[in-house]
Amino acid sequence: KIDKFYLLKVYKKDNKFLLIKNTKFNFLKNLKIFPMNEIEKHSNLKKNLNFKISNMSMNITIQFNKIKGSIPNSSWIDSSKLDSYTLPSFTKKIFKYLKKNE
């Protein structure tokens, strides 16, 4: 298994979260995900989530950010209406985690 580390950026406005169309990673291609970057493993980073996707273990650190300007290929998703969106289970699990850890 490959261990990978990601910094997931959460932008929240009222009850809405910003998602982007994934064009960066080979997994979940063209689906709506939270903006994130692959990072080096740092011992001082707090790991919030771990996902196993095929042969990869994803260690995810969550960072809350203020929106500055516009982010390409993005849209605001109302977290109280998640069922009305077509989202990958990966994204839904992150929503569930955020709701539980508000």
Question: Where do the PLM segments sit?
Answer:
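Intrinsically disordered, low-complexity, charged terminal extensions of DNA damage-control enzymes
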Residues: 1-102
